[in-house]
Amino acid sequence: MQRRDLLKGALVAGAGLALPARLAASVMTGTPRERVLFDIAKRELDRAGSAIWKRDIVGIADFGLHSAKPRFHLVNLERGEVQSLHVSHGTGSDQEHDGWLKQFSNVEGSNATSRGAYVTWEWYVGRYGTSVRLGGLDPTNDAALRRYIVMHRAAYSESAHLAKWGRLGRSNGCFAFGEEQFRTALLNLSGGRLLYADSLGLEEDG
C-alpha cells in the first residue's frame, strides 16, 4: 500500500511532506485529533517552505479551546507523537478574562494573540527569564517582532493558578507557559521550527 493511500481521507491532504512508513502507521493508529494535528503540521510546513529550517517538530496552538485545557500541541513528525501543554493567550483577545479567546489581532498595542505561522528564533534573557523570539510569517502576525511577541514562562500560566481560578492568566499577546511546560516547549521548538496559532477547537476526542 502506498503512503498516500494511508493518508487518504484526512482533513488536509497534499501537504507535500514524505513520511517514513513507521510514521504513517503511527499516525493512522493515533486519536482522531492527533491525525488532524499531523495533517495541519504538514500543511503548514509546506506552506511556510524554506522559512522553516528544522522540520521535525511543529507547535500548534489551538486557541479554540478554553485556557484550562492543554491546547498547545508539540507534533513530532519523526516519532509520530503529540505532546500537549497549557498556554496563555493575550489580554486583548479575552477582555472578559473568562478563559476564552474571542479575537485575534496583529495591531501594536492590542495585547492580543495573533493568528498564523511563526518561525522560532534565538533564545534571549528578558523580563520573564529565558524567552524565544518569534518571526511572523503571515500578514496576520507579521508585526510579531515589533510587538515583542515571544514564548516565555509566567506564574499566571502555572498549574497552581489554573487550580485556583479555573483558567490561566493572560499575556500581552505572547505564548506564555508554566515553568516546566515552558522548558519542554523551549527544548522541542526553538531554533528554526514552526509554531502555528489558530482557533481550531479540536477537543481531545477529535
Give residue spans per PLM region.
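N-terminal export signals
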Residues: 5-25
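Cell wall/extracellular polymer interaction/catalysis modules
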Residues: 26-172, 179-188, 193, 202-205
